[in-house]
Amino acid sequence: MPQSEYAKVHAFLRLSPVSAVPPLFQALNSPGLFCTISREPSHYLIRSADGKEATLSVTALEAYNRPEMIAGFIVGTSDTPDLNGTLLPVAYDLVCPNCYTKEDIERKLVFQDRLTMLCPRCNRSYSLRNGGIVVAGEAGLKLFKYRIQGYSRASDVLIINN
């Protein structure tokens, strides 16, 4: 059975101001750039593919809205246009979907290069250019994709909601 475009897993994240976090701002506004977002006890850790890191404090509003994720998020803008010729921001879970689904193991993916994520456990590589499909290693599920709602430079707020 083919995998649906969006994951059936509930996810939610609201971050603001995006412009205060260079790796996140660049990933949302530059085709071919991605970053990861991990939740720490008092802040979010945002890391770009080239290893640059930034933190964003968890505000009372963000804590109240209760972020939900499996392992974190991968956020960015593909350099491959959709069928309308548009380059839209996308969000995936940071968890390896195959280790999580088959073994119930929450293994975080790492950047293999700017547009590829690697699972250090099962050695599958996932393309951020092609919708999160497996491009190396044993065949399997593509990355869990989530909806980005309401991001614009004017609002300066990122909302991931599934």
Describe the residue ranges of each PLM region.
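Short cysteine/histidine-rich metal-coordination sites, predominantly Zn2+-binding motifs
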Residues: 111-122, 133-146
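N-terminal pre-ligand scaffold of iron-sulfur
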Residues: 2-110, 144-162
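A sequence/structural signal for flexible, mid-protein segments enriched
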Residues: 118, 125, 159-161
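Short, solvent-exposed loop/turn and secondary-structure capping segments
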Residues: 107-108, 130-132
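Short Cys/His-rich metal-coordination motifs, predominantly Zn2+-binding knuckles/fingers
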Residues: 99, 122-123
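Secreted/processed peptides and extracellular or luminal domains of membrane proteins
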Residues: 102, 125-128
